[in-house]
Amino acid sequence: MKVAIIGAMEEEVALLRNQIQNLKTEIHGGFEYYLGQINAIDVILLRSGIGKVNAAIGTALLIKLYEPDYVINTGSAGGFHTDLEVGDIVISQSVCHHDVDVTPFGYARGQVPGHPECYLADIHLIDIAKRSIDALQEVTHMHGLIATGDRFMHLPEDVATTREYFPDMIACEMEAAAVAQTCHAFETPFVIIRSLSDIAGKENAVTFEQYLDKAATHSARLILEMLTHLKS
């Protein structure tokens, strides 16, 4: 079994990279891929960089070169659901683009022409994530719609508009839908696992910097626990 793990920022991948045994680094297209084993499972770890284009290119190369059985996108996100707080975990049931709008041509808000309205995460991986969450004591989790856009959601008016169009979304970030769309194209099962570094619209630029390490730690701990369950 081979599991690919993708995070955008150094803080989001460093803890996982430190757990890789027999670590080897390969560079393709300017992206660094870290290869080795965690809990006796072959892993490919990618720091994609921020944004949808970076995530799509890095994920496409990863799948084509290494053919993983599963893709897990990890890192931080901004919370949208009123019951969530900084440090909580969100697990994707589905993923969409919140900044795509071709509705004049009959598509749903967030839908890329020729693609589904949203991308469904793998049921098996969702189940593994839910069972693994018990390892993070006193951490709230929620699963649902995660939405992606190429902007940091900090303006109250943007938050209000996005919430109007996507009332069911639980979190927003800047890479997940690109990873999901790429996995959909390659028919590779995926799940998005994010820990909240901020709550959308609540002074989140400052909060993000303060709590990024906490969010990265929670996400990494959950990924490590998921690998243990996948092995069994």
From Swiss-Prot:
This is 5'-methylthioadenosine/S-adenosylhomocysteine nucleosidase. One of its GO terms (biological process) is nucleoside catabolic process. Its EC number is 3.2.2.9. Catalyzes the irreversible cleavage of the glycosidic bond in both 5'-methylthioadenosine (MTA) and S-adenosylhomocysteine (SAH/AdoHcy) to adenine and the corresponding thioribose, 5'-methylthioribose and S-ribosylhomocysteine, respectively. Also cleaves 5'-deoxyadenosine, a toxic by-product of radical S-adenosylmethionine (SAM) enzymes, into 5-deoxyribose and adenine. It catalyses: S-adenosyl-L-homocysteine + H2O = S-(5-deoxy-D-ribos-5-yl)-L-homocysteine + adenine; S-methyl-5'-thioadenosine + H2O = 5-(methylsulfanyl)-D-ribose + adenine; 5'-deoxyadenosine + H2O = 5-deoxy-D-ribose + adenine. The keyword Transcription regulation does not apply. Pfam families: PNP_UDP_1 (PF01048). It is an enzyme of class 3 (hydrolase). The active site is at 12 (proton acceptor), 198 (proton donor). The gene is mtnN. NCBIfam families: MTA_SAH-Nsdase (TIGR01704), PRK05584.1 (NF004079). Substrate binds at residues 78, 153, 174-175. CDD domains: MTAN. HAMAP family: Salvage_MtnN. One of its GO terms (molecular function) is adenosylhomocysteine nucleosidase activity.
